[in-house]
Design a protein with these regions (language model features):
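Bacterial N-terminal signal peptides
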Residues: 15-25
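Acidic, polar-rich low-complexity tracts and alpha-helical solenoid repeat scaffolds
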Residues: 2-6, 25-274
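Bacterial N-terminal signal peptides that target proteins for export
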Residues: 2-17
């Protein structure tokens, strides 16, 4: 009986020892597998490696390196640069939401940064190019035909840039993009007005065209909005309003192609100087 008890106890000890050894082996393997290869790297080396990865298009590899650098070089200009580079990598990698989040954090944490103008510019650019880019040459879809939320947020970021940093090297490009955005917002209203007009909903077309004219100033889309008013009043036989609008059209747009050629093709956007 005693021998049996000792034998049972010995087996239990052996099993426990084997389990412990196995656990240590597994833990050791896991530690080796998950070892941080950058543990002994200098911040400058991490930065160089991250730039190389981003330069080759491996944004998924560059982003975690920039994140490590933010921690390793915290409180230094290099950490700020890493944060901006990470935002750019997120943007180029197709994660616009994360890029905006990173930039918002940068703007909040570093209000005195010499790179703050770039942060605003990049934030505007991310929203400007959201989903389809400046132009979609494949689908021929321009900004006025897309969701306007991103366009408005892009405009706000560019506006912050040019108002706070009018002499920034990024401001001239931002102003051009702002002009395009404003026209695209007006053109979006005109697109709806044109849709209503094509369906014979002339009152609705008038309302949307008037909204574009009331809300926006000095943008190319207003020429088409005015022409839509003219044609809608004509269709409704509202002679006085039609004639008044024709006089406005002739005075404001004396060489308008609309009066001779009708509605312009949406395949030929006005914006040519990009």
């Amino acid at each position: 009986m005693l021998v049996s008890k000792l034998s049972t106890a010995a087996k239990a000890i052996m099993m426990s020892a084997l389990a412990g050894a196995l656990s240590m082996a597994v833990t050791g393997c896991g530690t080796t597998a998950s070892a941080d290869r950058t543990a002994n790297w200098s911040p400058n080396r991490i930065y160089a490696e991250a730039k190389d990865e981003a330069g080759s298009g491996a944004y998924d590899k560059a982003i975690p390196l920039y994140e490590k650098l933010e921690g390793r070089a915290a409180g230094t200009p290099l950490a700020q640069q890493a944060q901006l580079n990470k935002a750019f990598a997120q943007y180029k990698g197709g994660d616009q939401a994360q890029a905006i989040s990173t930039l918002d954090r940068f703007i909040k944490l570093h209000p005195a940064s010499p790179a703050l103008d770039y942060a605003y510019y990049l934030k505007g650019l991310v929203n400007f190019n959201d989903n389809l880019g400046l132009f979609s040459f494949i689908s021929r879809q321009d900004l006025s035909e897309r969701d306007q939320k991103a366009a408005k947020e892009s405009f706000e970021a560019f506006r912050d840039l040019v108002s706070r940093f009018p002499e920034s090297r990024y401001s001239p490009d931002a102003r051009l993009r702002m002009a395009y955005i404003v026209n695209s917002l007006a053109q979006s209203e005109v697109n709806v007005a044109r849709y209503y007009y094509s369906r014979g909903a002339y009152i609705a077309a008038i309302n949307r065209a008037q909204t574009a004219i009331a809300d926006y100033r000095d943008v190319p889309a207003l020429e088409e909005a005015t022409y839509l008013l003219l044609k809608s009043y004509e269709a409704l036989n509202m002679v006085t309003l039609r004639d008044d609008t024709r006089r406005i059209m002739e005075k404001t747009y004396p060489k308008s192609a609309y009066t001779t050629g009708g509605f312009k093709s949406v395949d030929k956007p006005w914006y040519k100087f990009w």
